[in-house]
Amino acid sequence: EVKTSVKKNLILNNQLKKSNSPIVYKQKLKDKNTIYFYNDKKAVQSQIHVLIPGSNMELDERLTSRTFNKYFGSGMSALVFQEIREFRSLAYSAYGVYQVPWYLDGEGYFRGYMGTQTDKTVNAIEAYLGLLRNMPEKPLRMEGIKSGLLQSLVTSKPNFRSLARTARNWKLQGYDGNPNVLYKDNYESIDFKNVVNFYEENL
């Protein structure tokens, strides 16, 4: 009925080309340690970016990544911000997240950042790499993280204007339905051991 109404009331070109959107470019990260320097004489601080290649992600890893990110490096209460800025004053800003692929069968990767004074750059990098190599374990933070993630699902519901586009994207990504249902189940059942396992397998 909708299709008939659209054809009747809108003038559409019958020779429309099929869209290839969205275009997702394959990550091309180095398979060995590589350092790039960009010298800007006007820069007032060091901007440090950290990229670590990952591998194809299973659905369970994708779901767990959000909890890992909240624990490790997403937000002011995460390890990276607390250890780098709050406890050691080595950076103005700092974060680190495991970036999931747009498609379910894609490759993930770790993406980190620090903005710091030039004279603190080396110490900041050493501290950041220390967190990556030996993640501190603070399981008591889990309840607060889980509660916050469950609350975030309430505000992530698409509104009526974007519902059709969002549902289409879910299908294109490879989901059978609303992924928030999967995330809800994951948040309710996840424990700190899952976060540690994710860290050990992906970093």
Q: What residue ranges belong to the model's regions?
A:
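Short amphipathic C-terminal alpha-helix that caps PH/PH-like domains
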Residues: 6-10, 68, 124-132
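A generic secondary-structure signal for well-formed alpha-helical elements
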Residues: 9-17, 75, 88, 132-136
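Active/ligand-binding-proximal structured segments within catalytic/core domains
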Residues: 46, 50, 59-73, 79-82
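M16 family metallopeptidases and their MPP-like homologs
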Residues: 1, 45-56, 81-192
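Short beta-strand/turn micro-motifs at beta-sheet edges
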Residues: 35-39, 96-102, 197-198
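An aromatic/glycine/proline-enriched structural segment found at the starts
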Residues: 1-56
